[in-house]
């Protein structure tokens, strides 16, 4: 039996210490790769030509109400249901113990009929305090960047595009404060997701839900701008999206 002698390069290699690898500043500087959860999902969406459509959009002039989006893949159909409400500034916190949020939403398998919508309306806004339906794959909540949201909606309502450099300072219109999956609060367990070719990889369902939140945030801010000035309001430029 031939025994391979270690090369000089092999002898010099050694594992880095956890203190080096897990340093928070170092971790925060990592760039996305092909293995990153979001890029892996969006690559699959592009390759398979997933279709996203807005089926209901029941918002008032301030953007409060609900919206339903359909996510159609080659194999399955899913829906994302979003609930938007008024939130006092004193209630807006990113801590996990919060009990109210600007937005709550869910990703679920199949169709949304009137009976299911009634259940979702009563429970999804409550998050962990609600009785969640087992067809839900993901449940989440988010708070807005008040300044960024106001800046974008005001600019669009006046017929202008928001300043990109300013938007980069916040980087978002909404930020999730928790994204739950894998059986949390009674929703579908990961074992169930293994049967779906769309979401069998870890965190892919969660990333799909967050992707749809991003779409809703743009739809909502454009809606608010149109309500403020129907004659001058413009849509957000694709480069800003």
PLM features: what roles do these ranges have?
Residues 2-24, 99-241:
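Mixed-charge, Lys/Arg-enriched low-complexity segments
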Residues 25-51:
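Acidic-basic catalytic patches of nuclease active cores, encompassing PD-(D/E)XK
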Residues 31-37, 65-67, 191, 200, ...:
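N-terminal low-hydrophobic presequence detector
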Residues 43-99:
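Amphipathic, interaction-prone secondary-structure segments
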């Amino acid at each position: 039996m031939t025994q391979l002698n270690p090369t000089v390069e092999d002898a010099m290699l050694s594992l880095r210490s956890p203190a080096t690898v897990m340093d928070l500043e170092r971790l925060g500087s990592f760039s996305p790769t092909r293995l990153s959860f979001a890029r892996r999902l969006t690559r699959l969406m592009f390759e398979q030509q997933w279709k996203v459509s807005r089926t209901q959009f029941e918002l008032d002039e301030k953007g409060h109400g609900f919206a339903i989006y359909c996510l159609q893949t080659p194999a399955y159909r899913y829906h994302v249901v979003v609930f938007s409400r008024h939130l006092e500034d004193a209630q807006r916190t990113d801590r996990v113990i919060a009990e109210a949020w600007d937005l709550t939403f869910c990703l679920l398998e199949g169709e949304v009929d009137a009976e299911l919508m009634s259940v979702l309306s009563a429970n999804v806004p409550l998050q962990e305090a609600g009785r969640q339906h087992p067809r839900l794959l993901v449940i989440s909540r988010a708070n807005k960047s008040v300044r960024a949201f106001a800046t974008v909606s005001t600019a669009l309502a006046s017929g202008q595009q928001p300043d990109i450099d300013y938007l980069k300072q916040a980087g978002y219109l909404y930020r999730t404060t928790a994204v739950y999956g894998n059986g949390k609060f009674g929703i579908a367990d990961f074992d169930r997701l293994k049967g779906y070719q769309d979401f069998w990889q870890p965190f892919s369902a969660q990333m799909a839900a967050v992707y749809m939140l991003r779409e809703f945030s743009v739809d909502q801010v454009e809606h608010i701008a149109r309500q403020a000035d129907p004659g001058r309001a413009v849509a957000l430029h694709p480069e800003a999206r």
